[in-house]
Amino acid sequence: MPNGRPVQNGNRLPTSNWAACLEAEAQAAAQREAARLAAQRQAEQARAAAAQAKQRQPEKPIAPQKAVLRQGDVVFFTGDSLMQGVAPFVQQSLKQQYGIASINLSKQSTGLSYPNFFDWPLTIEQTFKENPNIRLMVMFLGANDPWDFPNPKGGAYLKFQTPEWEAEYLNRVNRILDAAKQHNAQVIWLGMPYMKKKKLDDQMRYLDKLFAAHLKDKVFWIPTAGLLSNGGAEYSDSVEVGGKIVRYRSKDGIHFSVEGQKLLAQAIMQKIEFAQP
């Protein structure tokens, strides 16, 4: 571009053409800048709209981490022989620390598989009706449930671990949850511990996962397997705690020693707080 003017085919463009060329380039640059600014404004408007929409959305309330009890409330203990050994220690702590009364209906050899032997959903429904001050139910069962059981609709037995078995079993769990909800009662539910015999342990691992998934956000859940094994991933009669060997399990590989019962009782108490009037 000699002498400041553009050259085309070796010849300098006339001054008028040069000016037109510069004007066209300036217009193109202005259009590009206008497009850039428009895109920037649109992006800023989109971000502002998204921020406003987020502010308008109600925040999801934070779920309480503990069951809350007040003076005059009653705690209801339910479950099988696993609960039978644990409940008395919790009852004692509730009474001594907070003056809270309790009802303990835990019963050995019971579960949800055979309501003809003992009907937990019905028993719980009746107990709530008879005791309107119950504000917390603590549940610990399942060890007696890994069996095929009769189909309430008739026909062949429902096979353990099948979808049909799960559906009916969880229907019974739901009856318990519904009874508690209807009476404004909170629920603490204990998961299944490791068991010494592999077959039973496999069955308990299945039930533990079933409970944990179904009860999520519905109860205060206490996993017991890792607790009783001091974080281990399998059954252990005894564990090392603070440099000492402590036996948490009984010789049958199912139930708990007194120390194990106290450990679970402490875990339950840690899920409870007392609100001053």
Role assignments for model-derived ranges:
Residues 1-74:
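N-terminal secretory targeting modules
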Residues 65-163:
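Conserved SGNH/GDSL esterase-like catalytic core that processes O-acyl groups on lipids
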Residues 82, 86, 90, 120-124, ...:
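Stable alpha-helical elements in mature extracytoplasmic
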Residues 83, 91, 95, 99, ...:
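Sec-exported extracytoplasmic/periplasmic mature domains
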Residues 138, 188-190, 220-222:
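Hydrophobic/aromatic beta-strand patches that form the interior of the parallel beta-sheet core
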Residues 143-144, 150, 174-208:
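Active-site segments of SGNH/GDSL-like serine hydrolases
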Residues 158-170, 249-254:
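A short acidic, glycine-rich active-site loop
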Residues 194-277:
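Catalytic His-Asp segment of secreted/periplasmic serine-dependent ester chemistry enzymes
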